[in-house]
Amino acid sequence: MDSQPTHFQLRSVVHDTLKSHQGQISDLTAQHEGSLKQLFLMFKPRNNMLDKEYDHQAIQGGDESLEGFDEWREQYKLGEGSSVNTISIPNLPAISPPATTVDYPDEPSVDLPTVASSSTSAARPNPIRDPSSSIIDSPLTNVPLDTSITSLVDGVEEEPTVNMSQIQPRPFVPRDYTPPPELDVPEWVPLDNYRPAATPTTPPQLLMPLTSAYATELPPLPLLNSTSSSASFRRRKRTNSPQPDMFKLQATFSLNPLSSALTRSSKCVLTCDWKVAMDEMRHVRAMERIEAKKAENRWSLRQPKKARGPGVPKSHWDYMLEEMEWMRTDFAEERRWKVVEAREFAYQVVEWHLASPEEKKALMVGGRGWGECRNVPIPGHAGKRKEVTVEVEAEDEDVEMLVGQEGELDGEGEANKVLESIDEMRVNEKERENRPEDPRETVNINQDIGEEVDAEGEADADGEPENGEADAEGEADADGGPVGDDVVGLSEIDAAQDDTRETSERPSYRRDTVLPNGLVIHKRFANAYEIAIARGPVLDTPLANATVDLDTLTKSSSAATPATVPAEPSVSPDEPASFDQLFPDLAMYSGPAPPENDKKYRRDEGGTYSHRMAHTSRIMDIRPILVSTLQPAKNLIDGEWDLHDGPYYEEVKGAADIPPNVVAAFNTPFGGKASRPLEHMRVPEVPKPAAHHLRAQLLWSPEEDKCLLKLVAMYPFNWDLIADSFNTEMILIPVEKRNPYECWERWYYTFGEGKNKPRQDAPPSAPPPAPASATQPGTATATPVPQSAVTTPGVPPSANLPSASGRPQQTGGNSVSSLPTPTGEALPDGAPPPPGMSKRDRMAAKPKYEGTKRSVRHQAIYDAVKRMNRRREAARAKSHKDNAQRKVINVHESHSMSFPHVAASTPWELVEAKYQRDVQIAQQRQQRAMQEQQRQLAIRQQQAMMSAQQQAQMRPPNMPNVPNMPNAQPIRMGPNGQPMPTMAPSQQQLLNAVAAATAANRQNANGAVQGNPNVRPMPVVQGQSPQVQQQMLLQAQQMAAQQARVLQAQAQAQAQQGRAPSMGGNLQPPQLGVSSPFAQSRTPDLPAEGAGPSGINPTPSPAMQAAAIGAQSSPQIATMGRAPSNNVPPHLRVPNAGTSSPQISSPMALPQGIPNGAGMPVQGAQTQGIQIPAAMMNNATVQQLLATLAASGQQMTPEQLRGLMLRSAHMQAQAQSQVGNPGTPQMGVQNIQGVQHFARSPSLQNAQSQPRSSPKPGPANGQGT
């Protein structure tokens, strides 16, 4: 049930609603007032638009423009009777002037419709009305507008224009305001003030796709340097830069280290940033070490000069380094000299080609001109040929002379042939320049310049047969027929003369011309100028034409200037020139030609199919670089580029991403550079190991296939590296590692060319073997299948296994290939053994393991373990047999003693034995200490008994028998003659007692005289801390209580002996037994066990009573006030049965001079047989407990007080129950029943439990170790 809203909640809601409405009303009021102010400013200037002072007032603005606004605002104020709705705002006409048909030089002409004049304003949709008819109630007086826009200025009529104030009254008026519709806007007439710029004389630059105006303004890049980028970067550094101040840097880094900012950085911190911080910290640490050394006077600003060490003799390596240094210098100088020589030779060659013939003659050796070397005899040369004048009369002699001369000329060397070819080229050039008309003049010119021409009637100078020339005597005929013995006659000489004349009359033709730059001009062109004219039409062809017709070039080439020397007749002038003739400077593309020799795969270096083609784009000449990569704002400084790295210095040579098949076609990882198809790249089969029959076929998961493809792409067809990388990355089990053959087989038959090909080792008709494991879709884990599903019924298991000799089959099962047959060949495709085989061969051919990969591995491991066990047993039996047969030679009869074989003890047994031995040693030491203490205690008891007897004789009869002790406090007696409880001794008295006890122990340790009661207490040091004083106080209380118990027990025994005859009856004499304040004989909650009829415990022997007193003491007081045994380490002490604390050792010797029974009257009265009421006893006990707690500095709480009382009562009950079976002093009071022993060994829990017996043979309880 929903609760009703309270009155306070309703009031709060109404208040919030009214407040929000009031805020909205105030916002609307402010907006309304602003809107009214804008409307007032828009309506106000409409009557002053033609006023000349309007512009000046509008510029000044201010509060004067709002004059009359308050009266006008009252009419349109929000509320009842407001006339806001009566305001009407006319529409705004077009602000921009109407379009015209003026043609500008830089704009295309557009035919636009003409705008109607002002006479047709009646047809407009928004007619302009007269201002007097406006419904807008303006606060100002309406002034009629002057529609005449013309005015006379200095007698000059202005051009018809429109004042902007008529269209837009004020510049700051919003755009949504329109002038009154009564305003008649005349037609806009543009002024003739457009003066366009003159047409530029130079055409504008057409930017190419790879250029921009910004890039063209940048300066050119510097030339590439041959040095590395690092050298240029080092050169960029300034050598004269001042060294930084190290101490200033240290102060800066120490005050504001960069490392502190990096650790709290909110942005990404790169490695370079951390390196900067590390360098900074390294510098700071170095400077700190320097400052530390300076403080220790171990740093000097002037470092001492390093001492010169002894000379080291040179070794062979030192001499070799010296020689290498000298050779390096020699080679560097030789290289520089060769560079200088080559430069000088290049300058001389250029100078030679640019020199005139006279200058060339001066430049040549000896000052002779070019071609004059034939006039200089060469030593050892036969000399130049001589012209022989032949007379007609001596024909026979001439014939003999010609024959002999011909034989001499045949012996000339190749030098003459070279000179002849050079002379012939020189003659041809001069003939082209002179252009002789008569061929006979050519012969004369040749004779003038020195060319050898055969004389009339002589044979050819070269001795070579020309047209129709007969062979020499003794040589074979030209037609192959033998020559007779006839001698050459004049007919042959005349024929030779006629042939020579025909040769001289024959015209010379042009040959190919070689230019100085190495280009060869075709013989159809005389010079390079003709080539430029011939290929002009090709270069002038528009870019839109994709082809060029060479037939159109015939006329242009024939129109060239006729050459001096005609071309060969084989070159027809009507035949068009080819592209290789027109462009000899460009390499023509030719496809790869078949090899001509046996080297099939040798690359054709002379072919042009692998070279750069013709110059078709400027990208082939330049390297386009984006301007953004150069970063001109960063690297362009004062018009110079500062580039030392980046894409500008990128190496041109780089390795491209070549497909693996292309790489494999040119190079193979297994040797050889000849390309081989992928079929020939099969990896040779890896040698099978000895236990190959134990290897199961491995399955390939999708992840492994992906890794294999990645490695094949990374290391193309390097199967050794692929297998190694695959096993490192994917395989974790050694038995599942893949070898290179398996990797190649998986790739070839799954992803390579053999994907759709049948395997060579698989029979074509054999069905695929049944899978031995089923792989779940999406997983790579094989699910084992029962063996019955693997094997085929009626067929041995080996029939379902792949062949052992071929490559491993990719089957679903994990079965092991069978063993080879006795002939050395495995059964093909796991077929059953033939029937003729023996049983042994059948068993050998049968597969050893079957099943999944895991089961096969487990079986193999199990068999290996069994074989190892058998070998171990065999080796052990053999060793026993050898030991039995071995004869033992006894050197002495003591060596023949047989010792029982004892197994080695475990560490726990050794520790236990050591502990038992230490316990025995400690007990023996403690017994000796106790005996010494008992001897000293007997001496003190005798002295106490003597002093007690003396005091008893001097005491009145009505006083209780209390031993008279020195410094004893008087006992206050009650009204019935019983002693009253007294308060505990003061702190100073207890401190004095502790000092006296310490002095007594020191005297006993030093061998002083025992029994001296006059022990001078040591003064208490006033500067001791409160904790030390409290500890000494507790020790004094403990020692005083123990000494009082012993003395009172002695006095009680003596009193019983002296009063026994006189007392009579069953009443026992009063006993002055003193006990610990925490050990009460009986409490209301815990009654004492073994008490007599009167409720008083029987009196034990003095030694046993001392033990009982030790058991009744509090654990806290006994722990802090115990006296350590004589020279017994704490870890070797064994507690006795007389105490419940594990740290209290045997009773110690009590010092003399301690008051007996001081502060213990209640316990003494109870020991004497005086019955103390429970209330009085509890009061005394509580007082003692409070005093003890206050002395120890603990907080006194009821819970803690009650716990201490219960513990004291329980301990007292245990001590009383043990009185019936006391132990002798010689036994060390360890046989008291019911008291637990807290020892180091967990095997001993109490005195009744026996020590644990050792499992090994030997003395019981570890006593014999």
UniProtKB/Swiss-Prot annotation:
One of its GO terms (biological process) is DNA repair. It comes from the Eukaryota. Residues 423-441, 498-510, 838-853 have a biased composition (Basic and acidic residues). Residues 700-751 form the Myb-like domain. Residues 114-140, 225-244, 404-510, 555-575, 755-855, 1053-1093, 1212-1265 are annotated as: Disordered. Residues 871-944 form a coiled coil. Its main location: nucleus. Component of the NuA4 histone acetyltransferase complex. The lineage of its organism: Eukaryota, Fungi, Dikarya, Basidiomycota, Agaricomycotina. It is found in: Nucleus. The gene is EAF1. This is Chromatin modification-related protein EAF1. Residues 800-821, 1073-1083, 1212-1234, 1242-1253 have a biased composition (Polar residues). CDD domains: SANT. Belongs to the EAF1 family. Keywords: Activator, Chromatin regulator, Coiled coil, DNA damage, DNA repair, Nucleus, Transcription, Transcription regulation. Component of the NuA4 histone acetyltransferase complex which is involved in transcriptional activation of selected genes principally by acetylation of nucleosomal histone H4 and H2A. The NuA4 complex is also involved in DNA repair. Residues 449-478 have a biased composition (Acidic residues). One of its GO terms (cellular component) is NuA4 histone acetyltransferase complex. Residues 124-139, 555-570, 772-787, 1053-1062 have a biased composition (Low complexity). It comes from Cryptococcus neoformans var. neoformans serotype D (strain JEC21 / ATCC MYA-565). InterPro entries: Homeodomain-like_sf, HSA_dom, Myb_dom, SANT/Myb. Residues 304-380 form the HSA domain.
